């Protein structure tokens, strides 16, 4: 039986999602909990919709795994949450078709990036939003964002060490909204390259402080050079918010 689960996690104390020797990761905690539940000495492989970096959070990460256990789907969150640490939670579980794949069946992903613009740092927000106290022109940020919507080669907006050859991606939605303590960026797309969302956020913040003009974003895309784009915003402001599937 293949099970599809939606999970959330606080990325602050994790070295990212993917298993790394000697480091605490989300995947490692999930697979350890499943091994206990299955009374197995071997790991139960877990597949996710995608990896998140160190410090990055998830409100709606999706995973799948295969199991011989006959636990009803609605009981799986209770069973796993009893074994998982407090910074990971299974929100929902459902039986999936054998052909379902958490990564390859996804048709769209949504990320959000949170910025708080208060004058002084807030110790209670320091792991969950980016402190950016400069005055921001939100309209310029929105104008700059328009150049990124659509299908483009995002070479300039991914880490230089990215090994993926095809860097063409489609951005469906990209906007900034004002919150009680700052701003929130919402972005949806067909998929994202390594550090792509963080570089987009950092570049649009540069537009907000007047470091670049909104129209310069177009030339950044055309340059196909990481050095042409703006800063990489820190990981702790980023959340994998939702993963969308056809069914």
UniProtKB/Swiss-Prot annotation:
Keywords: Isomerase, tRNA processing. GO terms for biological process: tRNA pseudouridine synthesis. InterPro entries: PsdUridine_synth_cat_dom_sf, PsdUridine_synth_TruA, PsdUridine_synth_TruA_a/b_dom, PsdUridine_synth_TruA_C, TruA/RsuA/RluB/E/F_N. The keyword rRNA processing does not apply. Substrate binds at residue 111. It catalyses: uridine(38/39/40) in tRNA = pseudouridine(38/39/40) in tRNA. The active site is at residue 53. It comes from the Bacteria. Its EC number is 5.4.99.12. One of its GO terms (molecular function) is RNA binding. SUPFAM superfamilies: Pseudouridine synthase (SSF55120). The keyword RNA-binding does not apply. Homodimer. Belongs to the tRNA pseudouridine synthase TruA family. Formation of pseudouridine at positions 38, 39 and 40 in the anticodon stem and loop of transfer RNAs. This is tRNA pseudouridine synthase A.
